[in-house]
Amino acid sequence: MKKTKIVCTIGPKTESEEMLSKMLDAGMNVMRLNFSHGDYAEHGQRIQNLRNVMSKTGKKAAILLDTKGPEIRTIKLEGGNDVSLKAGQTFTFTTDKSVVGNNEIVAVTYEGFTSDLSVGNTVLVDDGLIGMEVTAIEGNKVICKVLNNGDLGENKGVNLPGVSIALPALAEKDKQDLIFGCEQGVDFVAASFIRKRSDVVEIREHLKAHGGENIQIISKIENQEGLNNFDEILEASDGIMVARGDLGVEIPVEEVIFAQKMMIEKCIRARKVVITATQMLDSMIKNPRPTRAEAGDVANAILDGTDAVMLSGESAKGKYPLEAVSIMATICERTDRVMNSRLDYNNDSRKLRITEAVCRGAVETAEKLKAPLIVVATQGGKSARAVRKYFPDATILALTTNEVTARQLVLSKGVVSQLVKEINSTDDFYRLGKDVALQSGLAQKGDVVVMVSGALVPSGTTNTASVHVL
């Protein structure tokens, strides 16, 4: 059984009910809507289509809204045509948005471009394909030396590696997009270009103000500033997306894998979900099979401990969206089989909180008894994530009376969530847990299961782990 979850970006190729149903069958767990593209009518229809499929089939999936985020882009060029730049030439950026650009100058969307940069800084355009060095700053112009040949286009992203920029966490478009997400009842927001804790706080306040207090925030780490402030960002977020595309432009490419490993490890310790994203099966946008390196990249992220791996263009616009999900699911399943539990008996001398100690003990018991299932009663999902932290061989069955929690746990590795009407007592939980375990096929008659519960009130302390035979 696949434990690692798959996030699929949905686009024109995959938005129909028929395709969404096939994607769910192939292994999709979360639908990602990329708000850098598309309008509300398109995204609203995709949400409706997925909900129709879930209601008809009983399949489960969560919905993630990915914001465009604060970014710097080039503006107009003469005739809308790309211009060729040559290594060694002088090129100018201006904050005067009325300027129509050519092969010597282009306007950018960010007013603070001149004040944030210094002579000697690097400017990268179009995902780093064109590099420039700042040689002078004059009024509203930044004058650069072009470092390599390349074609510059309109509306291309501009990165300033190592530069702290004063862009707001929420652009006006993002604010409207988040209100749309609140109205639609999405489960997660992936917040782009998060640089510091206050960015997350601002987004959370905006969500709360529009009825989205239950939406979980997944912060995307895409630049050096986000890495520098990672601990405070993690503390304020519900999860992290390792967004390797922009990150690989902002920091040296050889550093990306180490940043990935650091972020995943810290998320595991903090019991926060983590998604590894970008270019995972990139060649499958055009080809029916991935490269060996891509397959290894997916497996490596799973071995690092990621909750989920993500498809972007592969599932949104590629030629082989279904094949991409199927192959990714196969890699997940194969790699999940060799994942060892992480109890770290010898290295862990920390004093644990009650919930953590009970959940750790439950995993230890399940490992020793070779139990196929750990059943957890959870209101907000914390107990299920506390068990997941130790990567048990057993599947985690999370019973909850909270519909939002049931959907959000879809993103957590190794967790199968089940919505139940009520849990009135510990005995009630034991009875329900055994019934669901058998009905779902996650365990068979005669199997040993470990059951974890606690105070049956919202956010109660988990304080009991017990062993049962079905």
Swiss-Prot record:
Keyword Oxidoreductase found: no
Site (Transition state stabilizer): 220
Keywords: ATP-binding, Glycolysis, Kinase, Magnesium, Metal-binding, Nucleotide-binding, Potassium, Pyruvate, Transferase
EC number of this enzyme: 2.7.1.40
Pfam families: PK, PK_C
One GO MF term: magnesium ion binding
Database matches in InterPro entries: Pyr_Knase, Pyrv/PenolPyrv_kinase-like_dom, Pyrv_kinase-like_dom_sf, Pyrv_Knase-like_insert_dom_sf, Pyrv_Knase_AS, Pyrv_Knase_brl, Pyrv_Knase_C, Pyrv_Knase_C_sf
Binding site for Mg(2+): 222, 246
UniProt pathway annotation: Carbohydrate degradation; glycolysis; pyruvate from D-glyceraldehyde 3-phosphate: step 5/5
Annotated protein name in UniProt: Pyruvate kinase I
